[in-house]
Regions:
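Binding-site signature for planar aromatic cofactors or substrates
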Residues: 6, 10, 16, 20-241
Length: 241
């Protein structure tokens, strides 16, 4: 028989610590990150994506989980000038231990899309969980809204080779795609990125949801899933006599 409802404050530390709290039938648990410190070796991309109501976090999850994107440019090819043209590009938004949300690409002006974007920098990219095992294990068709997609429309920018961002972007790409290190130097590959203007997510029934640029970059997936972050835990429990 339930005689009272208590509010218990406790602290839960990393995987090497233990919390002892006498409680039965936890009703609500709210977890908030306090420290923000990251132990990179312990960060793992969760197997299950965020809930549909966590739209910004879902966008970041898809981007960080993806190894490639579809990229749409405005064609400069003679017979289809002005038409949309789609190709596939390898992607990294940072090493596995550091999601930035910035889509970095390894591009060359010799490529059809690279030439298009040199003329008109407007671009749209799409990443989807259809490239992972998630949709397959859930038996979601790639077109099923629950097989989540993030669509980013923005400006294509060549990253300045003299900056630390260029080094970071290149390292991030090589970390995800080691074969890039051996691509022909004569093709003069370089690091580029997409600066978002509009961010859309389709992850459930009801249509596309818009995510503000601010919310997108504030939703840091790698901090949320870190196993060694110190947490404050507030639990509402039933106390049984």
């Amino acid at each position: 028989m339930v005689s009272a409802v208590g509010l218990v404050f406790g602290y839960q530390f990393g995987k090497n610590s233990t919390v002892r709290m006498a409680s039965i039938n936890i009703i609500v648990v709210i977890t908030l990150s306090l420290s923000g410190f990251i132990s990179g070796a312990d960060i793992i991309i969760p197997k299950s994506p965020p809930e549909p109501w966590q739209t910004a976090l879902m966008a970041r999850y898809i981007m960080h989980s993806s190894d490639w994107v579809s990229i749409a440019s405005i064609s400069t090819q003679k017979d289809i000038i002005g038409y949309p043209f789609v190709s596939l590009k390898s992607l990294s938004d940072g090493p596995k231990t550091n999601s930035t949300g910035i889509p970095y690409l390894y591009m060359t002006d010799m490529d059809v899309s690279g030439h298009d974007l040199e003329v008109d920098s407007r671009v749209t990219i799409m990443a989807t969980l259809a490239q992972s095992d998630y949709c397959r294990t859930q038996q979601y068709d790639p077109q099923d809204p629950r097989c989540a997609k993030v669509i980013i429309t923005g400006k294509y920018i060549k990253v300045d080779k003299k900056t630390s961002e260029y080094t970071f972007g290149q390292t991030s790409l090589f970390d995800r795609h080691p074969a890039m290190k051996t691509w022909p130097t004569g093709h003069e590959f370089f690091v580029a990125k997409v600066d978002p203007v509009q961010i859309d997510v389709l992850d459930y029934f009801g249509g596309i949801k818009h995510v503000s640029k601010e919310d997108y970059f504030n939703a840091n997936i790698t901090v949320i899933i870190n196993a060694d972050v110190e947490f404050a835990r507030v639990s509402v429990i039933e106390i049984i006599n």
